[in-house]
Structures are given as structure tokens and as C-alpha cells.
């Protein structure tokens, strides 16, 4: 749909519990209603949810457990299914399906796993399914630490090629000082660059049930803005906050990115040294240069070098002239097998498929 946006909404434990010891279901119902409203308008919504540990603690009757990683993992293992069941139940009221994605930092730092996660995310969004993301706290170890889901939401926004990231919290945004302790604290409305002064304003506050504070939200905002994604930190209790963010209505603190996600990605492609190269026929040259099309396996004549899926490669014509640089959807061995074949034959030849193109147009810079 023309004009549709992709919005990642991160809900911290303080928002989901309302500062209490249990999930605030009435508040979650309202947030789902807002998300469903925007989904119906054609926008793509991604949820990054905290609250698994809080849900587990509530379900087990608030047991007295030692403050250890194992205790957190126990509570997360119990609470994760309860939490996803709640999201599924509430979105189903509006006829919306959800898809659960449990991630760890390793899934996002390894290139192959990152691409697989991105493909899953895109498949869900393309089919109008709302991805609900949480860290896999039941198996992660070092990842259960301050700010992890804040940082995870920034990485999820990159995975989704999001237009905006909304970090919902129990504060109206970023202040010049802690408003709970300083009555003269002022809300910062617009941020065009994150520096040490701003980091000092964020402090290191952490809520009792969650693992994040304003400082980690600032870290997440920095990561997302560098990837070309605008970020808003706002109160989860703000009426109509999700619509306001999508519509561009001033709310909370807005962090402006310096470029679009596509511009950021293409700048990275331009600067990355090619890991290999492929030669394409005249039909592929015409499709790329004149039609702005993706490169299909059918147009590949030869493959040079050994490279992995997700690496940048050089694309040349039959005379050896550089045409473009792009990110390969398949590794070099796979492309050698696919060269000259139709896209419909990919699964038959390889036994798997990452899509019909060898290099997508959005992952390509023409020389």
C-alpha cells in the first residue's frame, strides 16, 4: 500500500506492568487496539516485547528466588508461553495473526543467521502477520543484562528495514534531568545527534522488574539512527501514541536519523570490498541498467571467487566492465550451480531456496 510505514514498537516491562508486580492487561489491550488500528490502514507493525520474566513470576505466584541468571531463565521459560498466548489472544480479536520470533544476540551477529532472521521477518510482514519478538531468555546467558531488549529492538528495526522505532516507557521521553527527582527537568523534544552531554542526561535508571533504563534506550536510539531509522521515546500511557508516531505528530522525544535505511544500506554496499564477482549476459545487463531490475540466476554466465551468502560481490558484463556491486543472496558454490537456470528451478537444483533473485535491486549499487 502506498504510504505505508514499518513501525517497530518496543514495550518494556514497566509499560506492560504499569509499575506493578503483574501484567497490566487492560493497558496491553489498549496498545494492541492501537496497533490493530494502524495495521488496518496498511502499516506494518512489529512488536518487541519484554515481560516474560514478569509473566513467569506472576504465574508461579511470586516465588522467592535468588537473584541469579538461572532464576531469570526459569521465570522466562515459564512466562514466555504465557506472554505470547496473551499477544495472540488479543490480536486475534481483530483477525490479526502473530508470529513469534525468539532471538539472541548471536542470531544477529552471525551474518548467515542474520539473513535467515531477516527473511523470516520479511515473510511475516509480507503476509500481514505481526512479528512478536523477544530475546530467548530461557537459553541466553550473557544477553540477560541491562538494556538488552532496548538494543534488541534497534536490531529488530534493522531486520525489518523499519521507518521508525518507538520505545515505549514509563516516562514521557528524554529529560534534561530525572523528572522524578528534579522538578525543573525539561522534556527534550528533538534530537539531531547523540553526544556525551545527552548520554549524561539519560542517567542509569533501571526499573525493578525490567532490565532496561533510559541510558540503554539512548544506546538503542543511537544504533537505529545510524542505520537510517528515526526513533521516538514516549510514554506507553500517552493516548494515541502509536498513531501519533506514524502520522509524525510531535510526541515524546524524537531522534532524527541522517539518512534513510535504503541510503544507509547502499552506502555500506558501496564501501565494502567485493568478496567475489559474477559475469552476466546482455539480457541481464539490459534488465539491470535499463529496467532497474534485480539480477536473476538465468542471466549469470560465470562466478569467480569464494564468497558467502550476504557478502558484497562485483557484477560485470561479458566485456569485463563493472556494472554494479551488490549483496549476493546465495554463496558462490550455489550460484555456480544456478548460473543460466530459471528461478523456478532453484529449489530443485539446490534443495532449498532463499528467493528467486541472485542479487536484489535494493541490495545493488549500479556503477
Swiss-Prot record:
It comes from the Bacteria. Its EC number is 2.7.2.11. CDD domains: AAK_G5K_ProB (cd04242), PUA_G5K (cd21157). It holds the Pfam family PUA. InterPro entries: AceGlu_kinase-like_sf (IPR036393), Asp/Glu/Uridylate_kinase (IPR001048), G5K_ProB (IPR041739), Glu/AcGlu_kinase (IPR001057), Glu_5kinase (IPR011529), Glu_5kinase/COase_Synthase (IPR005715), Glutamate_5-kinase_CS (IPR019797), PUA (IPR002478). Keywords: Amino-acid biosynthesis, ATP-binding, Cytoplasm, Kinase, Nucleotide-binding, Proline biosynthesis, Transferase. One of its GO terms (cellular component) is cytosol. Its main location: cytoplasm. Substrate binds at residues 50, 137, 149. Belongs to the glutamate 5-kinase family. This is Glutamate 5-kinase. It comes from Yersinia pestis.
